Amino acid sequence: MANTPSAKKAVRKIERRTEVNRSRRSRVRTYLRKLEDALTAGDATAATAAFQAAEPEIMRAVTKGVLHKNTASRKVSRLAARVKKLSAA
């Protein structure tokens, strides 16, 4: 339990930031889910469109500090490879 006024304020700030980060993370997951659905359905055009929507959202999460840069790069790279493979098939 926070005792000092500054510690109590820090707790309040952390709660607000946690809520914002939770919503950002949820937003990224939603885009990834849509892309995953398009990939499993085998729809190349939908997968490409979903990837083009998801990629900036993932990178935005990096800018906002929700995801680590390398994690996001790895996700984008693997998703791009899957979309490319589906489009080629």
UniProtKB/Swiss-Prot annotation:
- GO-annotated cellular components: cytosol; small ribosomal subunit
Membrane-crossing segments per the record: none
One Pfam annotation reads: Ribosomal_S20p
The keyword Protease belongs to this UniProt entry's keyword annotation: no
Gene3D superfamilies assigned to the protein according to its UniProt record, in alphabetical order: Ribosomal protein S20 (1.20.58.110)
GO biological process terms held by the UniProt record:
translation
Keyword rRNA-binding among UniProt keywords: yes
Note the superkingdom of the native organism.
Bacteria
| Entry-linked SUPFAM superfamilies | Ribosomal protein S20
Keyword annotations from UniProtKB, A to Z:
Ribonucleoprotein, Ribosomal protein, RNA-binding, rRNA-binding
Write one Gene Ontology MF term. small ribosomal subunit rRNA binding
| Family to which the UniProt record says this protein belongs | Belongs to the bacterial ribosomal protein bS20 family.
This molecule's function is given as: Binds directly to 16S ribosomal RNA.
Q: Which NCBIfam families match?
A: S20 (TIGR00029)
Q: What is this protein called?
A: Small ribosomal subunit protein bS20
